[in-house]
Regions:
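Core catalytic lobe of class I
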Residues: 1-126
Length: 126
């Protein structure tokens, strides 16, 4: 298994075509103060999906964490291959600074894309 922790656009050109079984990512949401947080910029999704077509096997699952409104934006970048969302219930809520103005956030979405059905091992739990 190879695990990369880097800018994907620096890594993708060096990956062998059709060699990826699972692409797990946590994209920048683009929801923070854009003047101070250079790392939270929305990526070029056309470029991302182009590379995915090259490096991923047809039954590769592309999985990303997200939260609204970014979840909707992410799904819209590849509606054709979007399959479903799961909900990650966090053990600790976030958003304490706005707790007097809105509910704290206790979950994130897990967004799943693929072209062909990947291996799926149901856990049969509720």
């Amino acid at each position: 298994m190879n695990l990369y922790h880097n800018d994907m656009f620096d890594v993708f050109p060096n990956i062998e075509p059709q060699s990826i079984d699972l692409l797990l990512t946590d994209f920048p949401y683009g929801t923070l103060n854009k003047r101070r947080n250079e790392w939270d910029k929305i990526i070029d999704y056309d470029r991302f999906w182009h590379y995915v077509d090259i490096i991923c096997k047809p039954n590769c699952a592309i999985v990303s964490t997200a939260s609204q409104p970014f979840t909707s934006v992410l799904i819209s970048t590849n509606y054709t291959n979007f399959k479903y969302c799961l909900v990650w219930e966090k053990s600790k809520s976030t958003g304490y600074l706005n707790a007097k103005k809105q509910p704290m956030r206790s979950h994130e979405d897990i967004v799943v894309f693929y072209k062909k059905q990947p291996t799926y091992n149901p856990q049969m739990t509720v």
